Design a protein with these regions (language model features):
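Membrane-proximal interfacial segments on either side of biological membranes
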Residues: 1-10, 22-568, 573, 577-669
Length: 669
């Protein structure tokens, strides 16, 4: 039994601080009145709406309270209505229960994070706080939660919550360790569902936290302006389109972050959607990326390997990358379909993305010419072994002959120093020629091939050698081949070539220019449109017929030229044969323009007896004395596939032509 004392609409003061109270009930034990003890059994206080800051000041006036002081300084505004129940036991111990509402509150934590429009109901009992129907705004994003539980033990406060909200890039960038604004439109808003647990001390300093969040997005553009993929993905346009996407994010105080990303993507909205999966994990400074995707809609080109995949052909990517501070490593890369396979392992990069080291590269694939390559390159310390069953070297040879940029792949390395051992069972040179058992080794020092010795056979008789060494401080490359045709074909302006042996020497003058000499012996030219047209325009139809028939034979061909990145400057080409001799010069711009000029003389002897040469006399001079063509000057110019030829008759030969011819005649004797 108890006695109730009630008072309504009062102001409760402690010193100068007050609270507006709607109702106060004091329950006194009935028996205690007669015993003159007047023991309180329960106190019920129902407040009116008060300012939260005033309540905190009121509490601090009653008792020094550090959390209350911190909250007082953090709360900018807000209202509270509360019902306070205090149960007093026989031993005078107390049990407190508080229920109430927080309205339109603004909270500034550490003067950095501002939470606005905070509204919720709360219930506190036995050091457990339950918050329901929470609504608030942070960075103009609405957050809601049906239930939040807080447990207060000693000097620690642990909060568990489920939150539904929209999330923008500002907020996502705070919890994710990369600036996502570089990749997404700033106006984009994601849907998020999160569970979190966070522990504070009595000064509201975070002691521990664990966040699990699921983020949903649809119809989103991923901007990749800073990532240069165009070189490898030909239909890449600096962005991809994402749809039906989901991210699962886990973050905790132990410096661990996990993100699982799964979405469909398109390079073009007309494409069929393909799957993209990314697993990201971060612990302290170590980050790990696992990427899986379907590249069916991508046009893929790997120029160094002469590989191309068109759209709507399967190709899948599995990639694992780790990052430690600013240092990246490709732990494994697998690019594959039913017919093609590319594998890389343990590629370590420096901060400038230059390769420091690698352990393995394997490729089994069909190239653009539908030739199947099977290559294995492994590295152990400073030794690299290149072993291949089949390897198409045609493109590599062409670059070696025609450009100074011969070691461009070495620019991928930070500073490679290694010995490379070669063992290639079959090396394709062109559609007609293969090298068997290409073996040897090369030495790379400071990213430069300073020495190489390679040898192979076309067949039991014809051989090939490649040598590279330093002579007088300059790198000199020498190629000899008993069969010249596959190498001569690499020069687009030389067509219709048959027979001959080749001797090629190139000296690197500096990083941008090399000087080369190409000599070919005992060969024929036939079905060569430019030469046939030249002979026809020069009224040398008889020799022109040879050019389209059995061919025009030459005893020797000399070419002296200089290579730069996209230009071959021809200082001199001299070809000597029993029917005609040619002297010319000019230049060839890579894939753009051929420009040649020179002289053609229809005989091997330069004297006044041209008319007496059997068979050719009537062709060259005609039936009447003084008729016929002594020689012509010519110009050949235009794109490689559309050359224009002009000729003019000459009556005398230049001293240079005569000198070069006499040199050859003397050597032949």
């Amino acid at each position: 039994r108890s006695l109730s004392l009630n008072s309504k609409n009062i102001n409760l003061f402690i010193l100068k601080e007050s609270q507006k109270i709607k109702n106060v009930d004091l329950l006194i034990g009935f028996d205690s009145i007669f015993k003159k003890e007047n023991k309180l059994k329960k106190i019920i206080i129902n407040s009116q709406e008060n300012e939260i800051k005033n309540l905190l000041k009121f509490i601090r006036t009653y008792k020094i309270n550090i959390p209350a002081l911190y909250l007082e300084n953090s709360i900018k505004k807000g209202k509270i209505i509360y019902d306070l129940l205090i149960y007093i036991n026989e031993d005078q111990s107390k049990r407190i229960e508080i229920t109430g509402k927080i309205k339109n509150t603004e909270l500034n934590i550490l003067k950095k994070k501002i939470f606005k429009d905070i509204n919720f109901d709360f219930n506190y009992r036995a050091k457990n706080l339950q918050i329901t129907d929470l609504r608030l705004k942070y960075r103009n994003i609405d957050f809601t939660s049906k239930d939040i539980q807080a447990n207060i033990k000693k000097n620690l406060i642990t909060i568990k919550a489920d939150i539904e909200n929209k999330i923008n890039l500002d907020l996502l960038s705070e919890i994710f360790p990369h600036n996502l604004k570089e990749y997404f439109n700033e106006k984009i808003v994601f849907s998020s569902s999160s569970n979190f647990e966070i522990t504070f001390n009595d000064k509201f300093k975070i002691r521990d936290y664990d966040l699990k969040s699921e983020i949903i997005f649809n119809d989103t553009n991923l901007n990749l302006k800073e990532i240069n993929l165009k070189k490898y993905i030909k239909n890449f346009d600096k962005k991809i389109f994402l749809d039906e996407g989901k991210m699962n994010l886990i973050i905790n105080k132990k410096n661990k972050t996990q993100l699982k990303f799964k979405s469909t993507y398109m390079l073009d909205k007309k494409d069929n959607p393909k799957i993209l999966e990314i697993d990201y994990a971060k612990e302290n400074d170590l980050e790990k990326f696992e990427i899986k995707t379907d590249l069916n809609s991508s046009k893929i080109e790997l120029e160094q390997l002469n590989f191309y995949k068109n759209k709507n052909k399967d190709l899948f990517l599995d990639l694992i990358i780790t990052k430690n501070k600013n240092i990246y490593e490709i732990n494994s890369l697998k690019l594959f379909n039913d017919n093609d396979l590319f594998k890389l392992k343990n590629i370590k990069f420096d901060k400038n993305f230059k390769i420091q080291d690698f352990s393995l590269f394997e490729a089994k694939y069909y190239n653009k010419e539908n030739f199947f390559n099977s290559i294995l390159i492994s590295k152990n310390k400073n030794t690299i072994d290149l072993i291949a069953k089949n390897f198409d070297l045609g493109l590599n040879i062409e670059k070696n002959l025609k450009s100074t940029n011969k070691e461009s792949f070495l620019k991928l390395f930070e500073n490679l120093n290694a010995i490379i051992n070669f063992d290639i069972k079959l090396a394709k040179i062109d559609e007609e020629h293969d090298l068997k058992n290409l073996v040897g080794r090369s030495k790379i020092q400071n990213n430069k091939v300073i020495k190489a010795n390679l040898s192979a056979k076309f067949d039991e008789i014809n051989t090939f050698t490649y040598n590279r060494d330093q002579i007088d401080g300059k790198i000199v490359t020498v190629i000899y081949s008993d069969i010249a045709k596959p190498f001569v074909k690499k020069f687009n302006f030389i067509k219709g070539f048959e027979g001959g042996k080749l001797d090629f020497t190139s000296t690197e003058i500096n990083q941008n220019i090399s000087k080369s000499e190409l000599r070919i012996y005992n060969f024929k030219l036939h079905d060569m449109p430019a030469l046939t047209k030249l002979l026809s325009l020069a009224s040398l139809q008889g020799i022109a017929d040879l050019a389209t028939g059995e061919g025009i034979r030459f005893n020797e061909f000399d070419m002296f030229f200089e290579n730069s990145k996209n230009l071959i400057k021809i200082n001199e080409i001299y070809a000597l044969g029993p029917a005609i001799s040619i002297l010319m010069e000019g230049y060839v711009e890579k894939k753009k323009l051929v420009s040649l000029r020179g002289s053609l003389v229809p005989a091997t002897t330069i004297n006044k007896t041209i008319a007496k040469i059997p068979l050719l006399g009537s062709i060259l001079v005609g039936d009447k004395a003084g008729e016929g063509v002594f020689g012509v000057s010519f110009k050949i110019k235009g794109p490689p596939k559309n050359l224009d030829t002009t000729v003019n008759p000459i009556k005398t030969l230049t001293p240079r032509f005569i000198t070069r011819t006499l040199e050859k005649i003397k050597k032949s004797k």
